[in-house]
């Protein structure tokens, strides 16, 4: 058990949502203000010290944030045994409607009860005028995306006329580069994970909180599969459904994706493949003398 802990704050480096460091000589002063507020202060909402072995950088591995290079995470971290996968018990059906747990743990062992929940990120679509601004749709839920698209295009038909979407009037739809940040849950996540990865994620779910399940290697493998599932759902349930709805209404689909860095989890080419015309963006900066 650890007796002493040391918290070290190092000097900050250039970074905007995972953007790579600029080449030598490039003038990035125009972008400096975008990250200034984040670099000027640090607010701690929760700070815990523990001597238990934990999954290194689990926040990034579990999709709570994004990382430019996942292969570089945890290099040199020693192996540690964790919770036996076979001893993880799903207590969901023991939860009462009022949120209390009705369960008597078996005698002779110590148990840790882990309760998982989810909430909205609060991210809104941007940039957009006030009357067209609202919460982002769940991009891992194809049914929700379909309802959103039907409502969105229905508003255009209502305003411009039923025959003004498709062959004339509004003839194309642009899906801009995705910059909504990290998200890592959807109501059908367990079901979709089983379908895409071929096994039940439930016994490994403590890993998304940093708990080592099985071993570090097993936990990292699960979290890799977890990120892959999120990426697959982003491509099929958001980009795929948007394109499907648009094309059925006679619209040409233009689309961008992740651009030059990783503002959200996803496979860039899998996301773009649904577009009639794949697009990208290019930024130029003046070179200092």
Can you say where each PLM-predicted feature lies in the sequence?
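Aromatic, loop-rich ligand-recognition surfaces of beta-strand-rich domains
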Residues: 1-73, 177
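Catalytic-domain carbohydrate-binding cleft regions of carbohydrate-active enzymes
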Residues: 66, 73, 77-289
